[in-house]
A protein has these predicted regions:
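Rossmann-like NAD(P)H-binding beta-loop-alpha module
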Residues: 149-170
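N-terminal Rossmann-like FAD-binding beta1-loop-alpha1 element of flavoenzymes
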Residues: 4-30, 163-165
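A Rossmann-like FAD-binding core segment of flavoenzymes
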Residues: 67-100, 105-108, 168-264, 307, ...
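Conserved N-terminal glycine-rich FAD pyrophosphate-binding loop of Rossmann-like flavoproteins
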Residues: 36-60, 186-190, 194
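FAD-site-proximal beta/loop scaffold in flavoenzymes
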Residues: 124, 129-147, 234-290, 294, ...
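Glycine-rich FAD pyrophosphate-binding loop
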Residues: 23-44, 174-184
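Residue-level detector of alpha-helix initiation sites
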Residues: 12-14, 37, 119, 158-159, ...
Length: 322
């Protein structure tokens, strides 16, 4: 059985910062994640994409942000249990015990859940399923691999427009197709794409893909119009994801749809179990990486008091000793 002061469930940005902050407070910490590498969705889905809304960074690549967070926590030697799912939650002597996949247990003084959206599955593009792996992708871990290609992006959300911005300087052509006239993407990103040599087609759907082993072309049909053929080497299907909390849904946590309800201390309804990041829900919640960092610090500070009621909630600033 492993034993630590704080167990962080989820190794995305909020979880990695929680690991740093627990170490800063002198607490031992373990980080558990079902994915094989730290970084959560950033590492799995968009490591090369530029992120523009993290304080102090005009723009930072996803993989660089993750690397910096891991380096920030490294002096405190957090234990990473990656490729390992936290499946059960129980209590022994009023302390949480996590049951891990494979039968191991992790006993801790407090749990901080930073599971993001939970496990996520891309929504499929029906006409393209036979080309998965040979022309259709749901994320682009290495954008440079699409250099000189004709790229078709399907979707109207932030991911679709972010990929258009990222791929336009590399690809021979970029076409973005959305089935509606209005977009869910941030207005500033839409305006940026409109200013680039990216073709945007609205009220349209991809009705057919051409190719033998690999994609060579696509047909798009505008509502009420005829099909149009265009050359395509890669289709980026940015249609969103279906999320699943997995075993967390069976732990007895109070849920609001797929999110964990927390109070102002980031405490859940279960003793010594806190949460931070996109997985949380409270009045006025805004799901940003930046807000997740603050929530992680709040959760860890309150977890520290749960471990030792005599401890100060605010430990001082990290710069106080310099």
């Amino acid at each position: 059985m492993h034993e630590v002061d704080v167990a962080v469930v989820g190794a995305g940005p909020a979880g990695l910062f929680a690991a740093y902050y627990a170490g800063f407070r002198g607490l031992s910490v373990a980080v558990v994640d079902a994915l094989p590498e730290p970084g959560g969705q950033i590492t799995a889905m968009y490591p090369e994409k530029l992120i523009h809304d993290v304080a102090g960074f005009p723009a930072v690549k996803g993989r660089d942000l993750v690397a910096n967070l891991v380096a920030q926590a490294a002096p405190f030697d957090p234990r990473y249990l990656l490729g390992t799912r936290a499946e059960k939650l129980s209590y022994a002597d009023d302390r949480p015990v996590l049951g891990l996949a494979g039968g191991e247990q992790l006993r801790c003084g407090a749990v901080v859940i930073t599971g993001g959206l939970g496990s996520f599955t891309p929504r499929p593009l029906p006409v393209a399923e036979r080309f998965v792996g040979t022309g259709i992708v749901y994320f682009v871990p290495q954008p440079a691999e699409l250099t000189g290609q004709d790229v078709l992006i399907v979707g109207g959300g932030d991911s679709a427009f972010d990929w258009a911005v990222t791929l336009q300087p590399l690809a021979r052509s970029v076409t973005l197709v959305h089935r509606r006239e209005k977009f869910r993407a941030h207005a500033a990103t839409v305006a940026r794409v409109r200013a680039l040599p990216v073709r945007v087609v609205v009220n349209a759907e991809v009705t057919r893909l051409h190719g033998g082993g690999a994609v060579t072309g696509a047909e798009i049909t505008v509502r009420g119009g005829a099909a149009e053929s265009l050359p395509v080497n890669t289709v980026v299907a940015a249609l969103g994801f279906t999320a699943d909390l997995g075993p967390l849904a069976e732990w007895g946590l109070r849920l609001d749809r797929r999110h964990l309800v927390v109070d102002s201390t980031m405490a859940t309804n279960l003793p010594r179990v806190f949460a931070a990041g996109d997985i949380t829900e409270y009045p006025g919640k805004v799901r940003l990486i930046a807000t997740g960092f603050g929530e992680a610090a709040t959760a860890v500070n309150n977890a520290a008091v749960a471990l030792d009621p005599a401890a100060h909630l605010f430990p001082g600033h990290s710069s106080d000793g310099t």
